[in-house]
């Protein structure tokens, strides 16, 4: 790793305590902020904190500019081999942290978290700042490619020495983190995800006109089935399984709506055309009306091979929409046979059968949705923000 040319200078400048706590949230890309973290910015700003964000491209996202007290650009990327992640990005981050005088820096994805902890290790050792990482799903999960798992496990073990608190959001990751020395120092904390706002994602909170608008936009008849998947178009989400399952399901009038962006949009829509269902597979792009899309849906799909604790399933269940998903880490903590339908990764026939089941037995589907809503109480955003309050308070008390 390249040296930190100004680390000695950083370490010589302890943090200055202020009456107003200062929090910097670090992510590789702004979509992580908009998808998961804006409620935290609102919560802590209302509590009297100064909350800022650093991400690549964040100043061009109006929702982020409005949500935070300030936003900062940084040139890191989500590509692990990008040399800038360990050359220019650390110096930029140290500059922002020195100027901002933050009490806590909280990172939220693997690359940003590794670079953050590497860059701030001198400041942290000097007691200038506390560093927190929420792992939204380790890359060394059960069933991961062996080389990938070995590399990411080793990197996380190293970086955990530069971490004050590591938050994990599922039981498999909690077990894995117990092997790190950080766990023996009490630095590993379990939280049930990043929370779902069950008040916002509740049938009573939504105007039915929103769901009607979505169905009208898609040209659906009143009783026409709508199967929805909300996920970035990347290989691990396995959109092609959803398309292939729809083609095999025999549900000739069902529509599959795919909300999200990503590099595989063209491949997925081409597959739909090749299978003769191109007109029934709709790539919706990035959307700001996810609650209405979910409320308009017959069921929500997520055939992923890797997840942490998927927000889309939490939101769907909170809205009493049945879910069809894979039997993998994190997901099985959210979904049981009573609240949804689970299948093995890559099992397209099972996914097709699940589609038929929710369409052909609507009462059973509604009962899954009702039970899913009850299950989400333990993942409510208010519970998770209270856990963050407790964690942050402990870190502030522990400041020199």
Annotate each PLM feature:
Residues 213-216, 267, 357, 364-378, ...:
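A short, well-ordered alpha-helix in the C-terminal region of glycosyltransferases
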Residues 15-20, 24-85, 173-181, 186-190, ...:
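N-terminal strand-loop element at the rim of the active site
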Residues 286, 305:
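Aromatic "clamp/platform" in nucleotide-sugar-dependent glycosyltransferases that forms part
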Residues 337-348, 357-363, 377:
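Conserved acidic donor-binding segment of nucleotide-sugar-dependent glycosyltransferases
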Residues 107-113:
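Short His-centered aromatic/hydrophobic patch
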Residues 34-39, 225-248, 263-269, 314, ...:
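A conserved mid-protein helix/loop that constitutes part of the nucleotide-sugar donor-binding site
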Residues 72-75, 157-211:
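Donor nucleotide-sugar binding/catalytic pocket of nucleotide-sugar-dependent glycosyltransferases
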Residues 322-325:
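Short hydrophobic beta-strand element within catalytic cores of glycosyltransferases
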